Amino acid sequence: MSLAEDIALVARQESALVFEHFDENTAWQLGSRLRQMAVERGYPLVIDVRRFGQVLFTAALPGAVPDQAEWVRRKTNVVARFHRSSYAIGLELAEKQSSLEEKQGLPTVDFATHGGCFPIRVKSAGIIGCVTVSGLPQRADHELVVEAICALTGLDYATYKLPQA
């Protein structure tokens, strides 16, 4: 799978994974779904669901370390700024052999273009927040979020799943 193909597939995920509505209860369902998936699979994750400016769900699972919360913050900053998944931004920069620091002057201490943060898009409202996980390799972080959003929105994950790298 080429970078260009991955970029196109992630863009397809971003445009298709849309919630009809999103409130505190939806955030709880999404965060709880991610937590359940992580527990069942033995993943040591930090999970964060937020509207921009307001945390709605957060959890740290056994084996997670404090640095993962810092990764959540840095990935969230990317999605809040660009309204794209952190993985999409990272893939596009990799294709151009560049970085956010080089292209935008954004410091890596505050911005991480690694997979795992995905915009929360609501029909008729646009992007209102993001969901982030940290603790797995970046592609796996990204895919776990996509799988959970598919489950909540009734979409078939197999249709949107990225192929194994």
Swiss-Prot record:
Organism from which the protein derives: Acidobacterium capsulatum (strain ATCC 51196 / DSM 11244 / BCRC 80197 / JCM 7670 / NBRC 15755 / NCIMB 13165 / 161)
Family affiliation: Belongs to the UPF0303 family.
HAMAP family per UniProt: UPF0303
Record-given protein name: UPF0303 protein ACP_1015
Pfam families: HbpS-like
SUPFAM superfamilies reported for this sequence: GlcG-like
InterPro entries named in the record: PduO/GlcC-like, PduO/GlcC-like_sf, YBR137W-like
